[in-house]
A protein has these predicted regions:
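Short beta-strand-to-loop transition segments that serve as allosteric relay/switch motifs
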Residues: 142-152
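GAF sensory/regulatory domain recognition
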Residues: 53-56, 65-90
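Short loop/turn motifs at secondary-structure junctions and domain boundaries
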Residues: 118-124, 154
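Signal-transmission linkers at sensory-effector interfaces
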Residues: 1-46, 57, 172-179
Length: 179
């Protein structure tokens, strides 16, 4: 009888794994880590480094770029990149990139898992376009390029992390307005 009570109190690790509880905690920890890293960035350079760390360690790509919005010219200019050829991806013209319009409205855009669709007019696979909001307005867009080979696509937890990037990475592009 005592043994039966104990099994109700403490589930086995296998049972927790089966029900998804361990995965949920892992996902929450990733989202928390991303938010904490961005909020504790000490300056603009550290905030940009935080974006790189989050993209590489939590989402699964070492090819990431940040483009600042030039509203007057309807273009996005490469502001910072890691693992991306800056000569190949220096300017994004909004009129030639229909998916960018959604990002410039403040909505992240994701490539479907195992899809050949590309989010930008480039030979390099683009998996996400994540707006960086400053005072609720897109000031820049994070472009997540090729994922690690073991990742089939952007997972639900990755979308949550991208939401954190969208709302907390403003310091990387507007260091004096976003704190």
């Amino acid at each position: 009888m005592f043994r039966g009570c104990m099994s109700n109190i403490s589930d086995s690790p296998a049972e927790l794994e089966r029900t998804g509880s361990i995965r949920d905690v892992g996902s929450q920890a990733k989202v928390y880590a991303a938010r904490l890293r961005l909020q504790n960035a000490i300056d603009q350079a550290d905030a940009l480094d935080a974006i790189r760390e989050i993209a590489g360690n939590l989402i699964g790509t070492e090819e990431v770029a940040v483009y600042k919005v030039d509203k007057k010219r309807s273009e996005l200019w490469l502001y910072w990149a890691f693992g991306v050829d800056p000569n190949k991806h220096s300017v994004l013209v909004v009129s030639r990139e229909p998916k960018l319009k959604q990002a410039l409205k403040g909505k992240a855009v994701y490539r479907l898992k195992l899809s050949n669709e590309n989010l930008l007019c480039t030979d390099d696979p683009v998996n996400a376009l994540v707006p960086i909001l400053v005072d609720g307005v897109p000031a820049a867009v994070i472009v997540l390029f090729r994922l690690f080979p073991h990742k089939p696509g952007i997972e639900p937890v990755d979308r949550e992390i991208c939401e954190v990037l969208s709302n907390c990475a403003g310091r990387a592009v507007e260091p004096y307005r976003s704190r």
